[in-house]
Each structure stands twice: as structure tokens, then as C-alpha cells.
Amino acid sequence: MESYDIIANQPVVIDNGSGVIKAGFAGDQIPKYCFPNYVGRPKHMRVMAGALEGDLFIGPKAEEHRGLLTIRYPMEHGVVRDWNDMERIWQYVYSKDQLQTFSEEHPVLLTEAPLNPSKNREKAAEVFFETFNVPALFISMQAVLSLYATGRTTGVVLDSGDGVTHAVPIYEGFAMPHSIMRVDIAGRDVSRYLRLLLRKEGVDFHTSAEFEVVRTIKERACYLSINPQKDEALETEKVQYTLPDGSTLDVGPARFRAPELLFQPDLVGDESEGLHEVVAFAIHKSDMDLRRTLFANIVLSGGSTLFKGFGDRLLSEVKKLAPKDIKIKISAPQERLYSTWIGGSILASLDTFKKMWVSKKEYEEDGSRAIHRKTF
């Protein structure tokens, strides 16, 4: 196959989140595959031959046999900590269980959180070009893609996932790098805090597989209170949650106390800004002439914005930080769990995408410098 033909193939889009990896082909409406971005290794001794084969599990198989495994996330706060595991997960994305394709036949669009260490991007490029032999690669910022997915060119995107929360103001398609705000408080921190609160209520989850149970409780039972002080004074109605072993757990005030961490990171001794400040400060760091427009175009993206009551709480908090008569409008697209991937799918299927990527030839000539030249 001629190298040009390969470059003309449909690009693969990988939204490499700290918690969930979404993958599929450009031009598709939704990602073909989504699975937790972790690897599982058996923690017990195999005594029967011919039973469960393999020493490493990824994707649905890891979820299915979770109780038998030690679960490890290769990414923490948007940065890859274990490149061997990360490589294995990407390998699995191309395998017969997933995209069923050869990596050397498709250009790749990979997402990354803004203000990430440049080493992270260089290593990702090295893995894709040298191990997977991809013909071309483009690394894009998550928030910009989320805006693509909504069909706008102006807005401030608040993207809060499992590892990173960031706000990126974009005006008429121009991102303003100096105005970007990022904090490393996101969904996984809420899960950890919920585990601590549940321990205080008398239920202990200690293994890495049980931490996944806590994550599920968070997703199903937690909500954001519009007025936490008031809710603290009232008796919170307890919600019954059925655990995998059939026993039930009554979740009380922990339901709103855990996600409160997103707005008050000092609950766990973190000095970062809360989500509302992240948005407001990003807007305030932008030019005065643009602020009114940005306040009226706040777009939510990422799984941690899916808590019940999130939009109302954010609106009431941002109002306190904005000038008095300014109009604040927050839009929460329904598909915001996947909006980064959807934006990537749109961008990668445009003709102009070919001008943006770094080809294998450029990478071989310039090395990692080529990557920095073409990403922002």
C-alpha cells in the first residue's frame, strides 16, 4: 500500500482519559469502544489449569473478573505514570476485541489535557510512531474538541473528568493559552473522598477492586447540593445501595459531601481553586472585551459534570464571582460524557485535518520538536 493511501484512510480517534478511554473511527457519531483505563493482574495463585488464561486483563474482561485482580490505572491526573501499562491498553484498542485494525494503516488523533508536562506528549508520540508505526499523529487539547462537538466557535469549556479539571476560553476559534486554568481535582478525588466518608459511616472498601465499587456508588447516589450548609442542618434522607454481594448500604450525608470537594478542595487539604473559581478566573484572565460573551457561553464537558444538581450549583457560585448585571448561561450537552471524542471525530474527518497532523516522515526528521510545533 502506498503511504499516501494509508494517510487517506479513516483516522482513529482516541480520547485517552484518566478514568475512561474512548476509541473509534473519525466520522462516527459516538465512540465505538469505551472502557475503564486500567489494567488488572491476578493477585492469587492459579491452582487449576485450563481456567482463566492470561496474566493481564484489560477492558470488559478486567471489569468482569475485577474481584480477582489488582486494578491499576496507568494515568493519574492526566499524566501517564506507567508507560508499559499504557502501551498495553493502546495495543488492546487496536486488537481483534476492539477496533480490529492495524495501527500502521490509520492516522491517529490523541487527546491530552492542557498544561500537561511536555515530556508526556513526547513519550506518547514516541510510542505511537516507533512502537505502533502510525503514519501520522495529532495531539489535541480536550476542551477545544468539546467545543467542536457543540458546533460553537466561542465559549469557555469547563471540562472535568476523572483526573483533571480545566477551563479553556475560546473566542471565534482562537484559544487563549494564557487564560487556561487547570486544577488536579476531579472525579477520582471525589471517589477517594467518598471512600473516606463511607469508612466513617462504618463501611470499609480497601482493595483496588472495591474502589471501583465506590466509584459506582458515587455515580449512582451522589448529588451536588445547592446549599450544603442548609443540607448539613437537615436530616439527609438515606439512599439504599445494593452492593455486588447482595448486601445493602445506606448512604447518608456522604451523598452530597463527597462531590462538594469539587467546589471546596480544602475539604481534603488541597489549596486548589474550586470549579466555580476555575471558570470565573479563566474568564477574568481573558481580555475585558470578551468577558461578557464568555460568561454567556459556558459549556460543560466530562463525566464529573454529570452529578445531579451540578449546573444549578455552578450557576449560583459563578454568579457570586461575576459582575452584577452580567448574563450567565451554562449549557450542558447531553452527550458531554463523550463530547471530547465526538469533537475529535468531527475534527479528524475534516479535510483541513491533514494540514494539522505530524507525519511519520516529519517525526523521523525532527523528532519530538515536530510534535510541539503542531500542538498548542
Swiss-Prot record:
Protein function: Component of a multi-subunit complex involved in microtubule based vesicle motility. It is associated with the centrosome.
Localization annotation: Cytoplasm, Cytoskeleton; Cytoplasm, Cytoskeleton, Microtubule organizing center, Centrosome
Swiss-Prot/TrEMBL keywords: Acetylation, ATP-binding, Cytoplasm, Cytoskeleton, Nitration, Nucleotide-binding
Entry keyword annotation includes Lyase: no
Pfam families xrefs: Actin (PF00022)
Source species: Homo sapiens
GO molecular function: ATP binding
Family designation: Belongs to the actin family. ARP1 subfamily.
InterPro entries: Actin (IPR004000), Actin/actin-like_CS (IPR020902), Actin_CS (IPR004001), ATPase_NBD (IPR043129)
PROSITE patterns, sorted: ACTINS_2, ACTINS_ACT_LIKE
Positions of post-translational N-acetylmethionine modification: M1
Protein name per UniProt: Beta-centractin
Main location: cytoplasm
Residue positions, PTM 3'-nitrotyrosine: Y4
GO cellular component, one term: membrane
